[in-house]
Amino acid sequence: MRVDLFDFDLPEENIALRPANPRDSARLLVVDPNENRMEDHRVFDLPSFLRPGDALVFNDTRVIPAQLEGVRLREGAPETAVSATLHMRADQSRWKAFARPGKRIKEGDRIRFGYDRDTVNSSSGACGLAHLEATVEEKGEEGEITLLFDISGPVLDEAIASVGHIPLPPYIAAKRPEDQQDQTDYQTIYAREKGAVAAPTAGLHFTPDLFEALDSAGIERHFVTLHVGAGTFLPVKSDDTDDHKMHFEIGYVSQETADRLNAVKARGGRIVCVGTTSLRLIESAATEDGTIHPWSDATGIFITPGYRFRAVDMLMTNFHLPKSTLFMLVSAFCGLETMRDAYRHAIETGYRFYSYGDSSLLFRKN
């Protein structure tokens, strides 16, 4: 399909720079293409749209401080400021990352992280800061590099935590710097498995009170893990969806969770994914007959209109970028024209977009 079919105009004022407070007071646009229904609600109304025996599927990944600032070290060349956003762990000492500016980096370069951009040319340098060094082992397309760190395992994790920053989405980072409030705001309350570069943002709306209301309504809660990579922020540069290449992300669905979700389906309950990351993982783990299997692997699933959904019945998700793979996904779920109408309504009525914005509850188109 032509990528420009998924384009729309989004005013700057619709982009959220901070989340709603409390989290579950965010707006919720309910869209059911099968009944031609579009209604404005709040996230705390979610239980009223679910039935006893339905199951919510959450992504319990935890955002790590994957934004690293440093300097390139090359013999015979001056130190040059660079940054790297880690996006997928390759092994205990290697990470794939997106480097900026990519043209300043080549294979074999050394990078010392722990330097702030502002200290590169200062006389005091980065004295007193923790340091972390790596070799650029491989350079790929779109600024992607493979970093081989000098340390590995938990020691490497601790070093990244020491020198790294939370990698806010570009459309927020362009407006303001990351601050202490983001340390809390950009994590779900149930985040536990470290490894994401971006938050599974639909989950940011949940509160203990909302969990209690869902429990009282007889709604099951299940957790899977997909470590969201920085590729989620990359624009689609091709003119046709067939030419776009997705970046892979590591995910896990346990045998116990797969069994419980299959039992929900067998009883007539619905699988309700909280976020596109949960949906992409469940659809990766499901076979054509809708059976969900355990999963421990990378997925690069790219869902566009025409895709036949295997297991997921409903989706809660925030509002996405024009021409993004995620807007393509929701268009596959509900129909392109339905989602164009929904986004037009959202923009006209002041819904807040993107990671810190409002949310939607989508029913899969029959």
Swiss-Prot record:
Gene3D superfamilies: QueA-like (3.40.1780.10). The keyword S-adenosyl-L-methionine applies. Keywords: Cytoplasm, Queuosine biosynthesis, S-adenosyl-L-methionine, Transferase. PANTHER family: S-ADENOSYLMETHIONINE:TRNA RIBOSYLTRANSFERASE-ISOMERASE (PTHR30307:SF0). This is S-adenosylmethionine:tRNA ribosyltransferase-isomerase. HAMAP family: QueA. Its EC number is 2.4.99.17. The lineage of its organism: Bacteria, Pseudomonadati, Pseudomonadota, Alphaproteobacteria, Hyphomicrobiales. GO terms for cellular component: cytoplasm. It catalyses: 7-aminomethyl-7-carbaguanosine(34) in tRNA + S-adenosyl-L-methionine = epoxyqueuosine(34) in tRNA + adenine + L-methionine + 2 H(+). Its main location: cytoplasm. It comes from Agrobacterium fabrum (strain C58 / ATCC 33970). Pathway: tRNA modification; tRNA-queuosine biosynthesis. It is found in: Cytoplasm. One of its GO terms (molecular function) is S-adenosylmethionine:tRNA ribosyltransferase-isomerase activity. Monomer. Belongs to the QueA family. It holds the Pfam family Queuosine_synth. Transfers and isomerizes the ribose moiety from AdoMet to the 7-aminomethyl group of 7-deazaguanine (preQ1-tRNA) to give epoxyqueuosine (oQ-tRNA). GO terms for biological process: queuosine biosynthetic process; tRNA wobble guanine modification.
